[in-house]
Amino acid sequence: MNYESALEYIHAVQWAGHKPGLSRTRTLLAALGDPHKKLRFVHVAGTNGKGSTAAMLASCLQAAGYRVGLYTSPFINRFNERIQVNGEQISDDALVRLVEQVQPAADAMQDVPTEFEIITALGMLWFAETKCDIVVLEVGLGGTLDSTNVIDPPECAVITALGMDHVKELGPTLADIASAKAGIIKPGSPVVSYGGVPEADAVIARTAAERHAPLTVVDLSRLTIEDGDLDAVTFDFDGLNGIRLPLIGSYQPRNAATAITALRVLRSRGWNIPDSAIRAGLEQVRWPGRFELLRHSPVFLLDGSHNAHGMRATVQSLRDRFPGQKFVFLLSIMADKDVDEMLALLLPLAGQFVTVAAHTPRAMSAETLAEQIRARGGRAEPASTIEAGVARAVALGGTGPVCALGTLYFSGDVREAFAKLNQ
């Protein structure tokens, strides 16, 4: 088996026809020696901000001197990004070796595991093999029935900002979504919640009380944003002052406040995490594809906001960083998202749209998306490929700002096309 065939094997099994549940993951991990039982975790769920918060947690724990695993999805440029230890992606050779280990166990199962379940098993094997002190584990979808939820009670569960997304899988109300996310709360294990949505907060508080899990809600009244530019946003939170965060979205200090709150909970449980490590970890964190500046002048931004809740935060960041300016938007949206609300948020800031389809069957076609924009009074033209779309958006932008957004699934392709254009 080589790297390409290993990836082919991983991607061969999709969700279709599989009943949600943890039994397949448990069976697979048991056949592999239950590597997850040797590990300690911070488990992160939420609608938006969970990847950024997970990256911040991992960076701070590493700065405190721990060996830290980080498990996230989706990837931006290469699959290996999803499984990292101390900021280093799993090597191609190690990935191939672990797929060769997982394949016979997976193939022997009557109810074969899904792609995400196989990747979760690969992550657990790698984190155990590399002797991680702690793993920051990002949920794939929901919480209760997500394959990451096979773990024993974590050192801390973290629930980031909640909003309406994945309603088909999780349910049509915020209470349903909160209930799925609250599934990661384990008996006696502390939980940190971003809060701010009463309907969801009530569900999380009730679940935490039922499971005797100490709950801390992030106190955003202690957050002050001092300054923000195209290099960093400076903020104070709960006694930590003047932190320069290189993730420049206006919403990122709120994610940082969530991470700091969780790190202090870990500290109360005996983890040695001084404030100096929290500061260092936040000031050197990297998390591609989230309000990321690929070029300062003229501005070219890349953002992975993929639902109305995330788009609202991105639009606020655009208003904060570029007051009064109009953008050329390079846009791709999944057909199962709230296209109406996403377009309503973007149209007031748009001079022009260039639409593309990300390389996934869920993507709305470039033509359909352009028609939807025109029907709402916007100017839009479809591009046949992402490469053509990037070139066209840059040409239309001239000296003005361009922002590529709508899904994480095209971030890697946009970055590659933009780099090629600027060679």
Annotate each predicted stretch with a short phrase.
Residues 18, 22, 26-38, 63-152, ...:
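ATP-dependent carboxylate-amine ligase catalytic core
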Residues 127-133, 269, 320-325, 393-401:
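Glycine-rich phosphate-binding loop signature in dinucleotide/nucleotide-binding domains
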Residues 1-16:
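Charged, amphipathic alpha-helical linker segments immediately N-terminal to NTP-binding catalytic cores
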